[in-house]
Amino acid sequence: MLRTSVRSPLLYRCLSKRFQSTAVPLSSKAVQNDLELTPKQQTNSSTTTSTNIPPQLPVNVEALYYAPLKNPVTHGHLVADLQLRAYDNENLDFFCDFILRAGYYLGLPMTGPKPLPTRRERWTVIRSPFVHAKSKENFERHTHKRLIRVWDSNPEVVQMLVDYITKNSIAGVGLKCTTYQRTTVDAKSGKISDAIEEINSTHNINPSLKENEEIGAKVVELLNTPTFKKYLEEK
């Protein structure tokens, strides 16, 4: 026979109901009467987390996550060539992306960036002029290039783009801009015929000196001087 001494009325009540044949579970009212429970309350911090939705980004800021937009080329008239050079690919590609985005908002039709051949330079020098004079050391430098072309644009707008990217340039990236301008030629005034005659006269100075026109023109100029004519007449 099991002998137990129950001193607490709550424990006695629980044990008595536990060993009953029906085994009815305790109700919530009985538990609340016997035990003082403090239910948890939901704070404001947990409810406000779902309302912290980030605001929608502007279109121009969201466009930074995509490739730069480009205006279509309509007439195919080349206006300018932008050639960029750098020793690092990352800064070069970043600045090309910046130029394309700036040109798009200015309304310039642009193509590129087109990768140009990389220039490789190597040097071999001695490590030291005294102790390590017999050992050599090699140095190598790579110059990366990109080409961006501007089409069908006003020269003033192109100059505005060049000024803007020059003002916001990146250290270590060189920029070379070549512009092309077109002017009207009046055939009635005779400018075309004068230009053709001038070109033909430079070629007909001496047929044997066509490969180097500047040297041939200089030789003819020296032969026509009075000092050379004096010696030629004596002979």
Swiss-Prot record:
GO MF terms held by the record: structural constituent of ribosome
InterPro entries: Ribosomal_uS10, Ribosomal_uS10_dom, Ribosomal_uS10_dom_sf
Pfam families (alphabetical): Ribosomal_S10
Transit peptide region: 1-19
This protein's UniProt keywords: Mitochondrion, Ribonucleoprotein, Ribosomal protein, Transit peptide
UniProt key word Ribonucleoprotein: yes
Gene Ontology biological process terms from the UniProt entry: translation
GO CC annotations on file: mitochondrion; ribonucleoprotein complex; ribosome
Highest taxon, organism lineage: Eukaryota
Keyword Mitochondrion: yes
Compartments it resides in: Mitochondrion
PANTHER family membership: 30S RIBOSOMAL PROTEIN S10 FAMILY MEMBER
NCBIfam families in UniProt: rpsJ_bact
General function of this protein: Involved in mitochondrial genome encoded proteins translation. Involved in the binding of tRNA to the ribosomes.
Entry similarity comment: Belongs to the universal ribosomal protein uS10 family.
UniProt protein name: Small ribosomal subunit protein uS10m
Gene: RSM10
